[in-house]
Design a protein with these regions (language model features):
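Short acidic/histidine-rich motifs immediately flanking catalytic phosphotransfer sites
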Residues: 35-40, 56-60, 173-178, 205-208
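NAD(P)-binding Rossmann-fold cofactor-contacting core
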Residues: 10, 137-157
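Glycine-rich adenosine-cofactor-binding loop
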Residues: 7, 88, 96, 115-136
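Phosphate/diphosphate ligand-binding glycine-rich loop within oxidoreductases
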Residues: 39-112
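N-terminal glycine-/charge-rich "phosphate-binding" loop or analogous flexible N-terminal tail
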Residues: 1-38
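Rossmann-like dinucleotide-binding domain for NAD(H)/NADP(H)
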Residues: 207-388
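Rossmann-like adenosine-cofactor binding region
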Residues: 49-50, 150-249
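Oxidoreductase and adenylate-handling cofactor-binding alpha/beta cores
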Residues: 96-112, 137-140, 275-284
Length: 389
């Protein structure tokens, strides 16, 4: 059996070669000729999988190691009898840590305190729920907006008083910060294409901090630029871009943090994407999933951090700890440097930065040894995912 896997799927060769002859190809470059004799296709979001790619091939199963599916033509799969899977939640913690790092970066750079700020989380699924938890750990007030879930349930699972969903108008009127974690939905009552449009920003609280680590087309780029120019929006974090990999340089030049769709690219997040697809392929084939990723996992890059707390604000200490584990500013710098190439090179560099992304480990693999520090600081670090001594 022939299998093709896209690059940027850690341990794909190790996992899928236990099932058949496996090749690794650059995701955006996979063509119909590459998959004509292939039965299993495992990939990420850079590969558009549709009739043009698959018609006339032997492909029986498509698995994407991502939480999104807008790159898959599912209606064609159903028509052609092709089974498929995705990896919901595989990188949810990674994205929530990216948002945490961004919040601390902005707060320390611009001199404001996160505690007491109101953050609106639009989309409270696998990612959004973790963002809510970490925002609360930082002492923020959280407004949750998720119309599909609100129709199904009036409260979150624990039925706590702080776990009610609110409508978008309330989020826009009250939130100091808004972060978006929705799927890309092109039509219907829950359409998210250009969710953040001119009306969205006009209704927002003046000086809004806006963050998008969902999908690029969720944001109307001209509307965002106008909101920045008019002072409606003060600071922006963008990890996803309209038209990516051919993103707009004028948008990049105006945002505080610009990264090339890597919020979910922690090593653990990518590995779990591979694992989830591998297990679904095994289920499809009716064979036991005997391969395990555990023996292949490398030691953490930053196993321990020792921090002197005396005389420093908790937020400054938190920023230092997070920065040592995840160099967000480095991601921003590399992306901006890559944009200096000519247009064709700039577009290629977007994919290159993603496929050759440096190893980033999640907070849970780092122990923080605090010299001093309050019980509150220790609790926050634990709630963010760190081990604390």
């Amino acid at each position: 059996m022939d299998i093709v896997c896209a690059t940027n799927m850690p341990f794909a060769m190790e996992a899928f070669s236990t099932l058949g002859s496996t090749r690794i190809l650059e995701g955006r470059d996979i063509k119909a000729a590459d998959v004509r004799e292939v039965e299993i296709l495992a990939l990420r979001s850079t590969t558009k999988v549709n009739r043009a790619l698959l018609e006339g091939s032997k492909v029986r199963f498509v698995g994407t190691a991502t939480i999104g599916t807008d790159h898959l033509d599912i209606s064609y799969f159903d028509q052609a009898g092709i089974k498929w899977c995705f990896a919901p939640g595989c990188n949810a913690n990674s994205v929530s840590e990216y948002i945490t790092a961004s919040l601390l970066f902005l707060a320390c750079k611009h001199g404001f305190t996160l505690e007491g700020k109101t953050i609106g989380v639009i989309g409270v699924g696998n990612v959004g729920r973790r963002v809510v938890q970490k925002a609360r750990a930082l002492g923020m007030q959280v407004l949750m907006n998720d119309p599909p879930r609100a129709r199904q349930e009036s409260r979150m699972e624990d039925n706590g008083p702080d776990d009610r969903f609110v409508d978008l108008d309330q989020v826009l009127a009250e939130a100091d910060i808004i972060t978006v974690h929705v799927p890309l939905t092109k039509e219907g009552p829950d359409k998210t294409v250009h969710l953040a449009d001119a009306s969205f920003f006009e209704r927002a609280k003046k000086g809004l901090i806006f963050m998008n680590a969902a999908r690029g087309p969720v944001v109307d780029s001209p509307a965002l630029l106008n909101a920045l120019a008019g002072g409606k929006v003060s600071h922006v974090v963008l990890d996803t871009w309209e038209g990516e990999p051919d993103y707009r340089l004028d948008v990049m030049s105006k945002v505080d943090i610009a990264t090339p769709h890597i919020a979910g690219h922690s090593f653990e997040g990518k590995v779990m994407g591979t694992v989830m697809v591998y297990r679904e392929v095994c289920r499809f084939l009716g064979v036991p999933a005997t391969w395990s990723h555990e023996p292949f996992m490398p030691a953490p890059l930053v196993p321990c951090i020792r921090v002197e707390v005396a005389g420093r604000q908790d937020q400054v200490v938190l920023r230092e700890v997070v920065r040592q584990v995840y160099d967000l500013a480095g991601d921003d710098r590399r992306f901006r440097d890559s944009a200096l190439a000519d247009n064709a090179g700039r577009i290629r560099n977007f994919d290159r930065l993603r496929s050759h992304y440096p190893e980033r480990r999640e907070f849970q693999y780092t122990t923080v040894k605090l010299i001093g520090g309050t019980p509150s600081l220790r609790r926050i670090l634990k709630d963010l995912g760190f081990k604390v001594e």
